[in-house]
Amino acid sequence: MEKLTEKDKELIRGSWESLGKNKVPHGVVMFSRLFELEPALLNLFHYNTNCSPTQDCLSSPEFLDHVTKVMLVIDAAVSHLDDLHTLEDFLLNLGKKHQAVGVNTQSFAVVGESLLYMLQCSLGHGYTGPLRQAWLNMYTIVVAAMSRGWAKNGEHKTD
């Protein structure tokens, strides 16, 4: 697993300090952007509510629970910047779960774009080129582990 620079860690921690206190609204911004960029992903969420307008889905309790879980994964990554390798098994399993529900690895890139969009919207002028790159570096490490889990899960499927 790759490592982040000390500057990357400092930038990520500093920006997450305020965002991490209010996870769900920031997560909703991220998922709103995700569904703008890749509307077909909305079909992967089979909740009891009709997700016809995207906003109905984004405000459903089940979906907000998913948003919370995603934001907690980001929080865990930020909390373990010095030892991201300790999250390896968790991230492998997360990749397997995403493969099992029909998420393809190309969608991970769109989630990354959506994360960066949320950071830009939330941080305003605090969103700088180096900050963007630091988050991208961390996200790349997280997604690499998830992709390995996704691939391993695919190997065990029989057609």
UniProtKB/Swiss-Prot annotation:
<keyword id="KW-0963">Cytoplasm</keyword>
<protein>
    <recommendedName>
        <fullName>Neuroglobin-2</fullName>
        <ecNumber>1.7.-.-</ecNumber>
    </recommendedName>
</protein>
<keyword id="KW-0349">Heme</keyword>
<comment type="subunit">
    <text>Monomer. Homodimers and homotetramers. Mainly monomeric but also detected as part of homodimers and homotetramers.</text>
</comment>
<comment type="function">
    <text>Monomeric globin with a bis-histidyl six-coordinate heme-iron atom through which it can bind dioxygen, carbon monoxide and nitric oxide. Could help transport oxygen and increase its availability to the metabolically active neuronal tissues, though its low quantity in tissues as well as its high affinity for dioxygen, which may limit its oxygen-releasing ability, argue against it. The ferrous/deoxygenated form exhibits a nitrite reductase activity and it could produce nitric oxide which in turn inhibits cellular respiration in response to hypoxia.</text>
</comment>
<dbReference type="InterPro" id="IPR000971">
    <property type="entry name" value="Globin"/>
</dbReference>
<dbReference type="GO" id="GO:0020037">
    <property type="term" value="F:heme binding"/>
</dbReference>
<dbReference type="GO" id="GO:0005759">
    <property type="term" value="C:mitochondrial matrix"/>
</dbReference>
<feature type="domain" description="Globin">
    <location>
        <begin position="3"/>
        <end position="151"/>
    </location>
</feature>
<dbReference type="InterPro" id="IPR012292">
    <property type="entry name" value="Globin/Proto"/>
</dbReference>
<dbReference type="InterPro" id="IPR050532">
    <property type="entry name" value="Globin-like_OT"/>
</dbReference>
<keyword id="KW-0479">Metal-binding</keyword>
<dbReference type="GO" id="GO:0005092">
    <property type="term" value="F:GDP-dissociation inhibitor activity"/>
</dbReference>
<dbReference type="GO" id="GO:0071456">
    <property type="term" value="P:cellular response to hypoxia"/>
</dbReference>
<feature type="binding site" description="distal binding residue; reversible">
    <location>
        <position position="66"/>
    </location>
    <ligand>
        <name>heme b</name>
    </ligand>
</feature>
<feature type="binding site" description="proximal binding residue">
    <location>
        <position position="98"/>
    </location>
    <ligand>
        <name>heme b</name>
    </ligand>
</feature>
<dbReference type="GO" id="GO:0098809">
    <property type="term" value="F:nitrite reductase activity"/>
</dbReference>
<dbReference type="Pfam" id="PF00042">
    <property type="entry name" value="Globin"/>
</dbReference>
<dbReference type="GO" id="GO:0019825">
    <property type="term" value="F:oxygen binding"/>
</dbReference>
<dbReference type="GO" id="GO:0046872">
    <property type="term" value="F:metal ion binding"/>
</dbReference>
<dbReference type="InterPro" id="IPR009050">
    <property type="entry name" value="Globin-like_sf"/>
</dbReference>
<keyword id="KW-0408">Iron</keyword>
<comment type="similarity">
    <text>Belongs to the globin family.</text>
</comment>
<keyword id="KW-0496">Mitochondrion</keyword>
<dbReference type="GO" id="GO:0005829">
    <property type="term" value="C:cytosol"/>
</dbReference>
<keyword id="KW-0560">Oxidoreductase</keyword>
